[in-house]
Amino acid sequence: MKRAVVVFSGGQDSTTCLAQARHQYDEVHCVTFDYGQRHRAEIDVARALALKLGARAHKVLDVTLLNELAVSSLTRDSIPVPDYEPNADGIPNTFVPGRNILFLTLAAIYAYQVKAEAVITGVCETDFSGYPDCRDEFVKALNHAVNLGMAKDIRFETPLMWIDKAETWALADYWGQLELVREETLTCYNGIKGDGCGHCAACNLRANGLNHYLSNKAAVMAAMKQKTGLR
């Protein structure tokens, strides 16, 4: 039996990954992390979506220690989430240091226990927003280290790594989940479901991607299929 574990936040990217995994694996588990995040409403959204999309199990893990160590606008109410700035340089204050290091490592430990062959994460280098832990180089390096440390061959899969946000919408549509992703996921840094606050960087990427996809469906779908190998 083919099993996979999805690092699942209930946002656009991880929900699209879950929708695809349900078609590609016999059994899919979801792992969601409570780190005291500002947008903590995502945990309840993730619970509902994991159930709706047929995950075999859904674990919510308490990693609030990360909140104590990592200072970010997503872990401190005293630090405002900035509005989207198209020409911003450097790492944004929404970056949570160590988050994906911790999430992927814990998901791999869970995968070890349930005998899953893959850990799936929705990180993306095309629209990575300046986060160093969303890069392909990082994911591959951590995958190698985790496998060495557990003497196990668990594969870190990144289905969205080389597609942009419009193509991510196309992928959700390909699996018949466009409206669910649009209406029921939570991507917004301010914790607003669906189309979100409309001001933060996450909402801007999501909205621009959707608008581009809806305006150029055939071309974007074709590009997505070419990049992912789907037919």
UniProtKB/Swiss-Prot annotation:
SUPFAM superfamilies documented for this protein: Adenine nucleotide alpha hydrolases-like (SSF52402)
Protein EC: 6.3.4.20
Keyword rRNA-binding tagged: no
Superkingdom per UniProt: Bacteria
Binding note for cofactor: Binds 1 zinc ion per subunit.
Alphabetized UniProt keyword annotations: ATP-binding, Ligase, Metal-binding, Nucleotide-binding, Queuosine biosynthesis, Zinc
Binding sites annotated in the UniProt record for ATP: F8, S9, G10, G11, Q12, D13, S14, T15, T16, C17, L18
Coiled-coil region list: none
Annotated positions binding Zn(2+): C188, C197, C200, C203
GO biological process, one term: queuosine biosynthetic process
Pathway annotation: Purine metabolism; 7-cyano-7-deazaguanine biosynthesis
MF terms in GO: ATP binding; ligase activity, forming carbon-nitrogen bonds; zinc ion binding
Catalysed reaction, written as an equation: 7-carboxy-7-deazaguanine + NH4(+) + ATP = 7-cyano-7-deazaguanine + ADP + phosphate + H2O + H(+)
InterPro entries, per the entry: QueC (IPR018317), Rossmann-like_a/b/a_fold (IPR014729)
PANTHER family the record matches: 7-CYANO-7-DEAZAGUANINE SYNTHASE
Family: Belongs to the QueC family.
Function field: Catalyzes the ATP-dependent conversion of 7-carboxy-7-deazaguanine (CDG) to 7-cyano-7-deazaguanine (preQ(0)).
Name this protein carries in UniProt: 7-cyano-7-deazaguanine synthase
